[in-house]
UniProtKB/Swiss-Prot annotation:
<feature type="binding site">
    <location>
        <begin position="17"/>
        <end position="19"/>
    </location>
    <ligand>
        <name>UDP-N-acetyl-alpha-D-glucosamine</name>
    </ligand>
</feature>
<protein>
    <recommendedName>
        <fullName>UDP-N-acetylglucosamine--N-acetylmuramyl-(pentapeptide) pyrophosphoryl-undecaprenol N-acetylglucosamine transferase</fullName>
        <ecNumber>2.4.1.227</ecNumber>
    </recommendedName>
</protein>
<comment type="pathway">
    <text>Cell wall biogenesis; peptidoglycan biosynthesis.</text>
</comment>
<keyword id="KW-0328">Glycosyltransferase</keyword>
<dbReference type="GO" id="GO:0051301">
    <property type="term" value="P:cell division"/>
</dbReference>
<comment type="similarity">
    <text>Belongs to the glycosyltransferase 28 family. MurG subfamily.</text>
</comment>
<dbReference type="GO" id="GO:0030259">
    <property type="term" value="P:lipid glycosylation"/>
</dbReference>
<dbReference type="GO" id="GO:0009252">
    <property type="term" value="P:peptidoglycan biosynthetic process"/>
</dbReference>
<dbReference type="GO" id="GO:0051991">
    <property type="term" value="F:UDP-N-acetyl-D-glucosamine:N-acetylmuramoyl-L-alanyl-D-glutamyl-meso-2,6-diaminopimelyl-D-alanyl-D-alanine-diphosphoundecaprenol 4-beta-N-acetylglucosaminlytransferase activity"/>
</dbReference>
<dbReference type="Pfam" id="PF03033">
    <property type="entry name" value="Glyco_transf_28"/>
</dbReference>
<dbReference type="InterPro" id="IPR004276">
    <property type="entry name" value="GlycoTrans_28_N"/>
</dbReference>
<feature type="binding site">
    <location>
        <begin position="269"/>
        <end position="274"/>
    </location>
    <ligand>
        <name>UDP-N-acetyl-alpha-D-glucosamine</name>
    </ligand>
</feature>
<keyword id="KW-0997">Cell inner membrane</keyword>
<dbReference type="InterPro" id="IPR006009">
    <property type="entry name" value="GlcNAc_MurG"/>
</dbReference>
<dbReference type="GO" id="GO:0050511">
    <property type="term" value="F:undecaprenyldiphospho-muramoylpentapeptide beta-N-acetylglucosaminyltransferase activity"/>
</dbReference>
<keyword id="KW-0131">Cell cycle</keyword>
<keyword id="KW-0808">Transferase</keyword>
Amino acid sequence: MTNVSDEKRILIMAGGTGGHVFPALAVAKYLSKQGWKVRWLGTAERMEARLVPQHGFDIDFIDIKGVRGNGVVRKLAAPFKVLRSITQARVVIKEFQPDVVLGMGGFASGPGGVAARLSGIPLVLHEQNAIPGMTNKILSRIASQVLCAFEDTFDQVQAEVVGNPIREELIALGQTPKDAGAKESLKVLVVGGSLGAKVFNDLMPTVTADMSKTHLITVWHQVGKGNLQSVKGEYQRLGLDGSVSVAEFIDDMEAAYRWADVVLCRSGALTVSELAAIGLPSLLVPYPHAVDDHQTKNAQVLVKAGGAFLLPQPILDIDKLIGKLQILSSDRDELDQMGQRAKSVGVIDATQKVADVCIRLAGKS
């Protein structure tokens, strides 16, 4: 069952986190510019329900939740809920008649991927992380084509390494020469995600105060929802108002990346890919509770290239953080070289590569 009109159509499945949604949006925008009709499959409770319509794409919802780590009752009920969600996805596919289905992670990808194959529609998978999620591990066995961002991601199936699709404006930023002006102050961008990172919020005020005694440092700190007053108050208590900007959430990450000399952050797949494409040095603190510790493996891509320092959270303290920042503040040549080494592993054409695979398979359907 395929679309009988001349207009090519793609159903994209991605949701739950920005690490799934934003790469998928990059592909959606690329194909939309090529004249494709794009539709989304997600869940009503997750971030895709808000983000996808904001970017001008229609979205359908199915009723599905994750089961890993949940109670016995939910696990026993899970097979019946999955069957229902597969049926819901098949209804969407029958109505939309896509030429190809692209799964990029999130709860909807599992039922949607199965529904695509049952409907005879080519299924393309893209895995953003260095360790695949459970859904993509399962779907990789029935997919028409498996794509991934990093080498050695899949053991059991052959996957093409294409990188992670990132926003056009960030790719352009990576092609723009850094300001060669005076660099008296080390500009540190601190990003802990939309909810912030407690470890960054706890440590950075003291780190900044101690660093300021011997080095010039300026901080732009995203503290996360609900943390603004407490973290800002601590910076103020330490007399750092003039050298620190504190925000609950940074809307313009392009501006933040352009401003920064170094980034202190988690090592989600999209973040790692953005840092590499732009060529930004980083201090990476993997989220210690990530499934299968995949953020540590993501980080290794930049660490092995020499573009980042790895700082595991269980051993992270004020002294270790100050030590790394002092190295970068004192040796600007090393800072610049770290940026170049990060850029050496960046992939800037991932969006086109993913889109090209979808176009090719749609032509065969």
